[in-house]
Curated annotation (Swiss-Prot):
Protein name from the UniProt record: Adenine deaminase 1
Species for this entry: Carboxydothermus hydrogenoformans (strain ATCC BAA-161 / DSM 6008 / Z-2901)
Family annotation (Pfam families): Adenine_deam_C, Amidohydro_1
InterPro entries associated with the record: Adenine_deam (IPR006679), Adenine_deam_C (IPR026912), Amidohydro-rel (IPR006680), Metal-dep_hydrolase_composite (IPR011059), Metal_Hydrolase (IPR032466)
Cofactor(s), names only, from the UniProt record: Mn(2+)
Family that this chain belongs to: Belongs to the metallo-dependent hydrolases superfamily. Adenine deaminase family.
Entry GO MF terms: adenine deaminase activity
PANTHER family: ADENINE DEAMINASE, N-ACETYLGLUCOSAMINE-6-PHOSPHATE DEACETYLASE
One BP annotation, GO: adenine catabolic process
Catalysis: reaction(s): adenine + H2O + H(+) = hypoxanthine + NH4(+)
Lineage, top ranks: Bacteria, Bacillati, Bacillota, Clostridia, Thermoanaerobacterales
Membrane spanning residue stretches: none
Protein keywords: Hydrolase, Manganese
EC number per UniProt: 3.5.4.2
Length: 603
C-alpha cells in the first residue's frame, strides 16, 4: 500500500468513527439549507455535515452537532451547491498567475480549475509548464493541468519558442497535478493535416495512446468537423474526448451523438454557449455531456462579472433549469475528468461547497474549500500569498527592434487588392475579404474609410526573425496602433494600426519591456503593461491591480484610438490562431486555415 492509499484509508476510518461514535462530532454543519442534489437533479431541505475537509452526510445532522461544532444556520433561505468547476481555461489569457486568478474566481464559487498551459508551453516548453505546475501546489483551490501534445499547433505555418512532441510526454504528463493532454489542436484541421503533414497525426497518436495508458484524459479540438473528419479526430484523441470549439447547434448535436463531451464556451470574447445549448432546448438531447467552460477571460471581466456563477446564470437565461445548469459545472465535468472526490455533495467527498442566495442570478454568499470558509460576500477571507515566478521563465523576448519599413506591405501601381482578415466579434473564427486600398511609394496603405488596417506578427524568440504581414477589418481604429506579445498560440508579437510608424513603435515598446501590451498614437506611447513571465503573465500586479490596468488600456484604445470592439487585446490575440478558420496571420504570413497554406497579402 503506497503512502497516499494508506492516508485515504486512515481518513475514511476517521469519518466512519465520527458518524458511528456518538462522542465524536462534525467540525462544521450547514444547517437548514436547500441542498442542490446534482445526482438526482432536485432541491430539498437538508443539513450538510463536514468533518475537516470531507462531507460526512447530507440530511438531518442534529446528532453530529457538539459544543465545538461550527453551525451556520441557513434558515431555509439559502441554496447549498457543490463547488463549481471551470473545465477549460488558460491562465495566460487573463495575464494573471494562478494565485491571482484564484483570488478573483474563488469568491464567485469556482473551487476547481482545469487549465491548459499550452500558451506558456508554446513560449517556453517544459520549463514553463513545470513552473506553472509548481504554482498549482500553493493555492487553496484545486487546480489541474492538461498539457499540450504539440507546439506549435501548425508546424511550418508558425514559429513557437519550443517545439513540443511525443518525446516530451513522459516528462510533462507526470508534473504535479497534470491529469491529461489538452486540446488536440494539431489535428483540428483534419483533412489538410492528413494530406500535408501526416507525420503530425502519427506523433499525436503516440502521445494520446501513452497518456491513456497511464490513466490520463485527452481533450479534443474539432472546430467545424463532421462525419469522417470528426470520427478521425475522436479516434486520434483516444475515442473519449471533449471539444470546446463547438460553435453551432448542428456541431454540438453530432459531437454528442459521437459520444464526445461538449464544453460550451462562454468567455470574454468567445461566446458559443447559446448555440450549443439549443441541442437541449430545441432537440431535446440529454445534457449529461454538456459542460460550461470559459476558455479565456480577462481580469477586468472576472472582477466585474464573476466567473463560473456568471456562466451558470447565462445558461439559465437560455431556458435551462437551474439545477441542470449547475450540473454542467459540477457533476458533468467531474465525471469527464474522473475527479471522483468533487462535483457532488455526498458522504466522503471533499467539502467544496457554495452557498447561494439567488438561484437565477447565481449570487454567491459563501464559498468553502475542503470544509474551510475561503470567501464571503464576494471577497476572499483567507490570504493567498503573492506568487513570484523564477527568472528562468522570464526574458522570453529575444528579437531585435523593428523598423516601420520592416512591417510594410509592398505593392505596385496606385491601388492594390489586398486579402483582408475579417474580425468577428466574440468569436475566434474569422471571415475572408478582399479590398482595394491605395498604394504610395510602393507600399499598400491603410484605408480608414473601409476600416482596412495593416496587421503584422513579429517572431519574438530569436529563432528566425520572420515577420508576417496582412490586412484586417473590424477594429475601427481612427489613429495609432497597439501591440502585444500574446497571440494564440505561438505567442509572437502581434500588432495592428493606422500607420506603420506607430505599429513599429508599439512592437518595439513590447520588445523593450520583455513582453507585454503597448498602446501608441502619433509617435507616443499612451499606455503599456509589462508581462515578464513568458511574455504572457504578470507576477508584479495582483488581480485587482491588473483589472484596473487592463480597463485603462481598454479605455485608451477606445477613446484615443477609436477602437470599436470590446476586449481588443484578446480579439487581436486570436487573429493568429491557425487552428480556427478562415484566415489568420502568423510570423510566416497570411494563413488560409482551410487549405493549410500561406497566401500573399496582395492579390
Amino acid at each position: 500500500m503506497d503512502a497516499q492509499t494508506f492516508k485515504t484509508a486512515i481518513v475514511r476510518r476517521r469519518l466512519v468513527d465520527v458518524l458511528m461514535n456518538p462522542e465524536l462530532k462534525a467540525t462544521l454543519v450547514l444547517k437548514n439549507g436547500l441542498v442542490i442534489n446534482v445526482v438526482t437533479r432536485e432541491i430539498y431541505p437538508a443539513d450538510v455535515a463536514v468533518y475537516d475537509e470531507y462531507i460526512l452526510k447530507v440530511g438531518d445532522a442534529s446528532d453530529l452537532i457538539g459544543p465545538e461544532t461550527e453551525v451556520v444556520d441557513l434558515q431555509g433561505k439559502y441554496y447549498v451547491s457543490p463547488g463549481f468547476i471551470d473545465s477549460h481555461m488558460h491562465f495566460e489569457s487573463s495575464m494573471l498567475t494562478i494565485s491571482e486568478f484564484s483570488r478573483l474566481s474563488i469568491p464567485s464559487g469556482t473551487t476547481t480549475l482545469v487549465a491548459d498551459p499550452h500558451e506558456i508551453g508554446n513560449a517556453l516548453g517544459p520549463v514553463g509548464i513545470k513552473a506553472m505546475a509548481e504554482e498549482t501546489k500553493v493555492v487553496p483551490n484545486r487546480v489541474y493541468l492538461v498539457v499540450p501534445a504539440l507546439t506549435p499547433d501548425c508546424p511550418g505555418l508558425e514559429t513557437a519558442g519550443y517545439d513540443i512532441t511525443s518525446r516530451d510526454m513522459p516528462e510533462i504528463l507526470n508534473y504535479p497535478n497534470v491529469i491529461g493532454i489538452g486540446e488536440l489542436q494539431g489535428f483540428s484541421n483534419a483533412k489538410y493535416v492528413y494530406k500535408y503533414t501526416p507525420e503530425i497525426i502519427t506523433d499525436l497518436i503516440a502521445s494520446t495512446t501513452y497518456a491513456k495508458s497511464i490513466g490520463k484524459i485527452v481533450d479534443g479540438n474539432a472546430p467545424e468537423l463532421f462525419g469522417s473528419e470528426l470520427a478521425a479526430h475522436l479516434i486520434a484523441a483516444g475515442t473519449e474526448a471533449s471539444c470546446h470549439e463547438t460553435t453551432t447547434k448542428e456541431e454540438c448535436v453530432e459531437k454528442l451523438r459521437y459520444g464526445m463531451y461538449v464544453f460550451m464556451r462562454e468567455g470574454s470574447t468567445q461566446k458559443n454557449m447559446a448555440e450549443c445549448i439549443r441541442a437541449v432546448t430545441e432537440e431535446g438531447l440529454d445534457s449529461r455531456r454538456l459542460i460550461g467552460a470559459t476558455d479565456d477571460m480577462v481580469a477586468e471581466d472576472l472582477a466585474k462579472n464573476g466567473h463560473m456563477n456568471w456562466v451558470v446564470a447565462r445558461i439559465i437565461k437560455q431556458g435551462i433549469d437551474p439545477v441542470e445548469a449547475i450540473q454542467m459545472v459540477t457533476i458533468n465535468p467531474a465525471t469527464y475528468f474522473g475527479l471522483k472526490h468533487v462535483g457532488v455533495l455526498a458522504p466522503g467527498k471533499m467539502a467544496d461547497i457554495v452557498v447561494i442566495s439567488d438561484l437565477m442570478d447565481m449570487k454567491v454568499e459563501k464559498v468553502y474549500i475542503g470544509g474551510k470558509l475561503v470567501a464571503e460576500k464576494g471577497k476572499m477571507v483567507v490570504n493567498i500569498p503573492k506568487y513570484t515566478y523564477p527568472e528562468e521563465v522570464k526574458h522570453s523576448v529575444k528579437c531585435k527592434p523593428v523598423t516601420a519599413e520592416a512591417l510594410e506591405i509592398k505593392a505596385t501601381g496606385s491601388n492594390a487588392v489586398v486579402r483582408t482578415i475579417g474580425l468577428i466579434p466574440d468569436q475566434n473564427l474569422t471571415e475572408s475579404f478582399e479590398f482595394t486600398v491605395p498604394v504610395s511609394g510602393g507600399v499598400a496603405q491603410p484605408d480608414l474609410t473601409q476600416d482596412v488596417l495593416p496587421i503584422a506578427v513579429v517572431e519574438r524568440y530569436g529563432r528566425n526573425g520572420s515577420i508576417g504581414r496582412a490586412f484586417v477589418r473590424g477594429f475601427g481604429l481612427k489613429g495609432g496602433a497597439f501591440a502585444e506579445s500574446v497571440s494564440h498560440d505561438a505567442h509572437n508579437i502581434i500588432v495592428v494600426g493606422t500607420s506603420y510608424q506607430d505599429m513599429a513603435l508599439a512592437v518595439n515598446r513590447v520588445i523593450e519591456m520583455g513582453g507585454g501590451v503597448a498602446v501608441v498614437k502619433n509617435g507616443r506611447v499612451l499606455g503599456d503593461l509589462r508581462l515578464p513571465v513568458g511574455g504572457l503573465i504578470t507576477d508584479e500586479l495582483d488581480g485587482y491591480e491588473l483589472s484596473r490596468k487592463i480597463a485603462e488600456l481598454h479605455r485608451l484604445t477606445a477613446v484615443e484610438l477609436g477602437c470599436t470592439v470590446h476586449a481588443p487585446f484578446m480579439h487581436l490575440s486570436f487573429l493568429a490562431l491557425t487552428t480556427s478558420p478562415k484566415w489568420k496571420i502568423t510570423d510566416q504570413g497570411l494563413i488560409d486555415v482551410n487549405s493549410f497554406a500561406i497566401i500573399p497579402p496582395v492579390k
